[in-house]
Amino acid sequence: GQVWRFDILNGQDPSNLVTGGVIAQLGAEGVSGTPTADETRRFYNAPDVSLITDNQQQRRYIAISVGSGYRAHPFDLSAADRFFSLRDGDVFNQLPQTAYDSYSIIKDTDLVEVSGQTQTVITSSDRGWKFTLPMNEKILAESITFDDQIFFVSFTPDSNAAATCSAGKGTNFLYRMSAINGDPIVPNIDTLDPLISDIERRTTLQQGGIAPSPTILFPSPDPNCTGDDCKQPPLGCVGVECFDPGFKNNPVRTLWTQDGIE
């Protein structure tokens, strides 16, 4: 449950070429004393790293998103699994080793809880947010971030799966949340009852078993057509089960970016 960051200082001699260290402990490592079963979260997937521009706070930061789940034992029901989205504000700064040696490591308790909430304010001093999954749900695949929205799939085993020898199909849910504050992506967010916000964050997938990570596809234009109407909208898919990702623009290739330049 540890997240590491490394800075590569080009042109330096080998002894000073790389600096780095742990910046977050989201599982048992971050618990003082003996962790409970609830706190023993396991992580099997690489973090989903994206550059976010927060227009309200007029700043940019790196969002590091990752979910917990015991993939080696998907029927395990002991841990209280969560989805985490950390904030690293040192987007354009190369940190010296002394900064990593004294780094204030992000713990689970440092993050703002957004489950059962809407329009949560994540301030510039907050280290990020977390979403506690409903009971028995876990995340067994990587998330993906597009257009400041995070897409990820959770899995919950059949109610009797842990007590039987049969595999069971289980149920998969597709989540779609704001990368900025974890809000559900809905048109009525200003009036949405927080009590049903978690339901609005997810949809039930038809496929059983452990579903793969979501992916975003950008189909080629229709070759037999001319004009803007021929452009195909982006398409999100989890395996062969596809969905509307909620945005229409095609990606813009960015080869580099600079501090102060949007």
Range-by-range predicted roles:
Residues G1-E262:
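Beta-propeller fold recognition
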